[in-house]
């Protein structure tokens, strides 16, 4: 399970973890710069994040896995499936569509991005290097504004994939999600009506009703 970026963390994925652990071994990891995971010293790339995920998988199992990712975590999931097809048997990607520079502009500004905001006071208690938080935001702005998730990536994904999104998602607009779905060879599409980016927090029952049968079919 791969959570969303910046404001995201494993606590947002609790409902998935609770449901999945009844039938599956669940591996939930915090990505670089989130929770107790270090930011690192090398430039941020989804290839690097995919290798992080593979390292965690290898530490737990040598079997192939199902990857469920949300937002930033879904883009990482796409890359894991592309680079390591033999290790990913299924994938659920939530809130992540086609992306090229210029389609959106990401800025981590405003009151919620005040380092003294209570949200960040709590998050910094977990961080190994809390003094790097603001620079991490600036680096992530640059990363998100230059990232590419295009036909070459999506057509390289061979595993069975469920592309899921909220109808009103402004981070990954509906048209971009449909484009991703159409480019992934073995994919299914689920759109949750009248929900936004964090669709599973608005209507988890509807999201789970799409995911559960997808996972249960061999």
Residue ranges of model-derived segments:
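Conserved acidic catalytic loop of the alpha/beta-hydrolase fold
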Residues: 47-65
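Active-site nucleophile elbow and catalytic-triad environment of alpha/beta-hydrolase enzymes
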Residues: 137-153
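Acidic catalytic loop of the alpha/beta-hydrolase fold
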Residues: 168-172
């Amino acid at each position: 399970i791969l959570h969303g970026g910046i404001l995201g963390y494993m606590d947002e994925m609790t409902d998935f973890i609770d449901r999945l652990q009844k039938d599956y071994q669940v591996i939930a990891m915090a990505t670089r710069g989130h929770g107790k995971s270090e930011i690192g010293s090398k430039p941020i790339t989804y290839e690097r994040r995919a290798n992080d995920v593979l390292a965690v998988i290898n530490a737990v199992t040598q079997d192939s896995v199902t990857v469920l990712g949300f937002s930033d975590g879904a883009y990482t999931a796409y890359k894991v499936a592309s680079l390591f097809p033999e290790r990913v048997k299924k994938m659920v990607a939530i809130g992540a569509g086609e992306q090229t520079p210029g389609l959106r502009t990401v800025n981590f500004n405003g009151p919620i991005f005040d380092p003294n905001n209570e949200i960040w006071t709590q998050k910094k208690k977990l961080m190994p290097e809390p003094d790097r938080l603001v620079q991490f935001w600036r680096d992530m702005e640059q990363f998100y504004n230059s990232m590419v998730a295009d036909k070459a990536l999506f057509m390289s994904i061979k595993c069975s994939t469920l592309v899921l999104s909220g109808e009103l998602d402004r981070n990954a607009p509906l048209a971009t999600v449909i484009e991703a779905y159409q480019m992934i060879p073995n994919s299914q599409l689920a759109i949750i009506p009248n929900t936004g980016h964090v669709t599973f927090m608005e209507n988890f029952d509807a999201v789970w009703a799409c995911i559960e049968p997808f996972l249960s079919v061999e």
